[in-house]
Amino acid sequence: MTKNIVNTALVLVGAGSLLTGCNFEQPETNCFVQESPSWAVKYDVVDSPKDANGDECTTTAPLVELMGVYKYVNPETGAAQLALRPATLASRAIADTTTTSADQTSLGSLDTEPKDHGFCHANDFAPAFVNVAASDTAAANTIRYEFTNVRVYSAAVAPGTQFTGELKYTSNGCTSSYVMRAVWPPAPCDTASTEPAENCGVGSGLNPEFAVVCQPTSATGTTGYCVPAGDIPSFK
């Protein structure tokens, strides 16, 4: 059983995807994942970038980016899988004739039932990568994502709309490690705005019970995406 990850469209926008309330002891659901071509993902650095010789280097993962997230279930075995497709890879895939969409997407095994505190664990992810051809101003490069210990929060209060995990990111020969904090839907924001709808507040489209902050896409900019403010699950 296969699905075309690149062309998969968001088809599930049910009333349960934006739940409110503060009773976090509601009955658990199965391992639900909000499938979408765009989640907002924040990367918190754990280990600074180093090259193959262990020397410090400067290339890092994005501060925040969009990521495609999809769940697949084998109808014959019932086994579930989770697919992660970072925008950094997808945006460069068009110019890469040496890899396929399968190479550019990380696929791992996913629990079928929540375990501890409403989390569904996903592991055994294959690395995802693209090869960037050399240009007049830059050498050839391989950008590589390696995900581990991914945990989707699937409790009934907010089923499948937040996840966390670990990332090892390599680009330009620099490798660094991060903890991920991700939320759906992706809400654009502007730290310079006083309008709640433009700064992760009322009207942003996010679950009003989520504790979120605006993370600019660059260190000097003001525009970016709303991301979880704390550890997952991030609630007020």
Curated annotation (Swiss-Prot):
Lipidated residues (N-palmitoyl cysteine): 22
Residues covalently joined to lipid (S-diacylglycerol cysteine): 22
Alphabetical UniProt keywords: Cell membrane, Lipoprotein, Membrane, Palmitate, Signal
GO cellular component, one term: plasma membrane
Source organism (scientific name): Myxococcus xanthus
Membrane topology qualifier: Lipid-anchor
Cellular compartment(s): Cell membrane
Record's signal peptide: 1-21
Name the record gives this protein: Putative lipoprotein MlpA
Domain of life: Bacteria
